[in-house]
Amino acid sequence: MSCRAAPWSRPSVPRARSFPASARLRNPFGGMNVWKNPILKSSWRIGDVPMIFGLPSGLFKCMASSSSGDGGFSRPQSTDEAPMPLYSWPDKQRPRVCILGGGFGGLYTALRLESLEWPGNNKPQVLLVDQSDRFVFKPMLYELLSGEVDVWEIAPYFTELLKKTSVQFIKDSVKLLRPSDHLRREPAGSCTGGVVHLESGTVIEYDWLVLALGAEAKIDAVPGSAEYALPFTTLEHALKVESELTMLERSRFGKSSPAIQVAIVGLGYSGVELAATISERLKNTGTVKAINFQTTVCPSAPPGNRDAALKVLESQNIELFLGYSVSCIREVYAPDDPGSMVTDAEEAGSDDKKLLLELQPAQRGLQSQVLEADLVLWTVGSTSQILRLQPPDAPYVIPLNGRGQVETEETLQVKGHPRTFAIGDSAALRDTAGKFLPANAQVAFQQADFAGWNIWAAINDRPLLPFRFQNLGEMMTLGRNDAAITASFIEGLTLDGPIGHAARKVVYCLRMPTDEHRVKVGMSWFAKSAVDSLAALQNAVSNMIASS
């Protein structure tokens, strides 16, 4: 079985063998059984200091875990601190896998683990932790602004997606990571991968950890950007932008109202998709201004996608400011007299608020400019969450690169941490040419397959597979009935226009997390398409009758 092919097909399960009793042993926690992997020798001491959960044992005096098997919480007792709730795994013997982050990497890893066949009693308990209660199909957030999709279609609840699986879900934010799989262990000790501290105070002890937390928008890049610009990376961001656009449209309703002005910073994929979608939505009621540091749009995109994007942006009369960077965003108030700008809200109504973007040339031959906007969207820059999750009072034990991403082996294991995997935007992994893999859904989707398989292999003492990214092409939406798709396996082929739009929706429908949700979304989209086609036919017939 080749390394490239294995994750894409259902793996052949190695011949089942009984798990040796010596691999299960009792630890100091009320006689609770934990998992022991032969490749990691156990220890509960660092030097002369006994350790529990990767911390000095004096901090904890744990009660026996609940035996009810309900996946609830039991509380450890501490002699000198307030008790912390300890997550109680339903089964005290099977391995415990904790997945942090419920995006493409985290959710699909959980579903991959659920789909594999496990010999004996080796099937792990899987716990998924995310700060939101919804999975978000981020490549289709733009369709929320155009009205093509409903929230439930691209942001289903985790509980709905996982209801037919054994995967448990907790809505919470990660506060601290304390891995212990890098420590030297003694044969007589117990073995655990470490613990995770959540913002609620809950402590999760695990045997295997998957870091799939993704990245956050870096919105504080220049003065005023954090206060006045909106990012577009989450469902909450998309709903906020939709709300702002709706309020602007309502307030400017009428022929004499000034045009709505939207400024978009950054013209990578996200910026271009936003510009095309919003410009099509506003039509003659507004203008879109797009700023980019480079002198072209989508600089990392294939030529076919880049040409299609530029064609649409120009056809929609989007104002492009290429070769500029934003140095500052500030708020002013513009009364009815356009020649008088004031900075005091008391001198002008709040409805007259305007935002000014100061642009500095990034290329020679350009002059500084000041743009006016009602709404500013920020699509450049991101930051990793891992750096702030490591203990501030201890040396960093998770290796990070200069961008705050986790350094991993080819097997997606964190370097020096054989029981910890990192995937998606959290991980720094290079392709065979030495270039960093792009931070997109396609990479995370493929890594989830490998991560799930490699956890299966590690638990069952099988060789782990090195991750190999297979670039299947790139897609982007360019409006309600327009998109561009470049397939990597057919050189020079780009599908755009309505054909590209239809192909993109079919591909994304097939990529939905579960079969049940896939069917629901497919039926919903088909019904909407039928209604749109009927409306278009009626308009065409009406126009023919009117012109005859």
PLM regions and their residue ranges:
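N-terminal chloroplast transit peptides
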Residues: M1-S43
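Rossmann-like NAD(P)H-binding beta-loop-alpha module
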Residues: E242-G286
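FAD-site-proximal beta/loop scaffold in flavoenzymes
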Residues: E81, E227-F253, V370-Q446
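Beta1-alpha1 glycine-rich phosphate/pyrophosphate-binding loop at the start
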Residues: P85-I170, S225, A263-I264, E273-G304
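FAD-binding core/adjacent interface of flavoenzyme oxidoreductases
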Residues: I39, P50, G54-K61, S65-R94, ...
